[in-house]
Amino acid sequence: MKKRLLSVALCGLFLADALAVEIRVAPGQPLDAAFREAREMRRLGSIGHNDTLFITLADGVHRIVEALMLRPEDSGTPQSPTVVRAEHAGCATIDGGVALTGWRRATREELRGVPSATQPNLWVCDAPRVNGRIVETRQLWQDGRRLPQASLVPQDSLLPMLAFDKEHREIHIPARYATFLSRNPHFQPWMLVHQRWAIALLRIKEVVMADTLAKITFLEPESRREFEHPWPQPVIGDTLDDGRIVSSSFNLLGDVSLLDRPGEWVQSYPNGLIYYVSGDKGGARPSAEITIPVAEQLVRVEGSLERPVHDILFDGIRFAHTVWTTPNREGWVTLQAGFPIVDAYKLAEPGLPHKASLENQAWIGRPQSAVTLFGARYVNFSHCQFVNLGACGVDFVESSSRCDVADCHFEDVGATAVLIGHFATGGHETHAPFLPFSADALCREMRVVRCRVKDVGMEDWGASAINAGYVSSTTIAQNEVSGCKWSGICLGWGWLPAPKEKASLRRWPMRDNHLTGNHVFDFGLQLHDCGALYTLSYQPGSSIEGNRLERMGRAPFATNQRVFYIYLDEATDGFTIRDNVMPEWRIGQNQTGPKMKIEE
């Protein structure tokens, strides 16, 4: 007997004789089948001109292992939108994780390198296989709490490095710290490096002891990226304004020998075995479910400039559990704001056509996101939740317009919660102006409003809560932002002053953007050279008004004291700034332009 997986119903709405067509999906039923059915109904004309098409997710967990794809054929219309909704707001989850099961005690061989004091509390289990491959991860969650990987010191603590040797591509640390590493070939230890306004995650290649020093080298390509790129690099022995002498800091992670605190874990390779130090009484088997993420993305909207995806609303959906493993393959060295360096180096002779004083070049990539959108128009998110994510939350990459993220909640996000717009990635040198021939290539008329963003940059400290790059007519308003390791809300990219050529000015991509009525607090918790609100480049007609900014972080391992409530970084110009509330007048300016209007 065949059973229908998806139920389709016609139900009356109190909307001027309009009908709603509803496709209901229960947990365990395939989400992609629901969207295919909706696509076919539109193709065959089964939906009236004024009918709303609802795809309703029943309460519970809807697990996926590959991203749900939406294409132009999935589009609605202004009169007949497609609404993807939870049966009850926040109670239906699109989830990229699965529960770890089969916990057992480790064998003698598996205990190799584990500290003896940890062994009575240690449990192991096999990572699941998905599509024929063992799941590799850098994230685990227990009852919604991100579990820390095994580390030399707690992950909110760091230790000062002794030297940063660019010639030999080495970082020097006290030898006593490196003796902890087990040299077990089934584990890949790595180093977290704190460097000015960013971090680097570097896989360790070799440790050479030299008296009281440990000289550490790293795998490629991150070794080349870390030691060749000039900004930002670690500092050694800098003197602060208050007379303190500081050096950049580090931590060691990912080795079985570092398992010494309850809740810590590590994964071996290539068998994927998960090692976990029980926090339960008496070191008992973990009683609360531990989730391993298996999906890198949950939703991918694939439109284009010529054929956008449009008129779709996600309403009340909870998005949870994505995996981020890029550093396991190539390390992670960022330029700024969580954008990874692909190649960067100092110029022997400074100068590029658009800036004679520029002394470096850099090409960057883009971090992954749980929900990624290309060519979207009127694709909106309302009352959604984005939690327990390996990297970013929502990313409007390019060619998107009139999209809203409204009344949403973001918490425990590995990198940036909301990304919008072009950031000069790929083959576009990141300092070179982005001047698209068509304004439609930009993200414009975008809104992020009334959202609550808490605890971002959990994996990459250099990320911000909300970041809009080359955008126009974009509003970020009435959001509550807290728990940022670096800056809170960022607007602009490129380090670009107003162009002198009229043709370039007509095509200028950043203008008429507004940061209004946001409440940002508890920012700069780990990295400085930051602001609660942070801007770059010339943006005529833009404003920063009516924001409440407070509680800047101390960043105990920062090597500079550049932390501001509003940071107008290089070439910021064209803004009106007024009526912002902050404990003290602390606005940083770095080579700002002549067209600023700042009122106390």
Give each language-model segment a name:
Residues 4-14:
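Sec-dependent N-terminal signal peptides
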Residues 18-20:
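Boundary at the C-terminal end of the N-terminal hydrophobic targeting segment
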Residues 25-375, 380, 426-437:
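Extracellular polysaccharide-degrading/modifying enzymes targeting complex plant/algal/animal polysaccharides
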Residues 51-53, 60, 66, 80-82, ...:
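The right-handed parallel beta-helix/beta-solenoid scaffold, focusing on the short coil/turn
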Residues 56, 63, 69, 83-85, ...:
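Extracellular beta-strand solenoid repeats
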Residues 66-67, 296, 323-329, 368, ...:
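Short glycine/acidic-rich loop motifs that flank beta-strands on beta-rich extracellular proteins
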Residues 145, 153-154, 321, 325, ...:
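Extracellular beta-rich repeat passengers
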Residues 310-321, 357, 377-391, 400-415, ...:
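Right-handed parallel beta-helix
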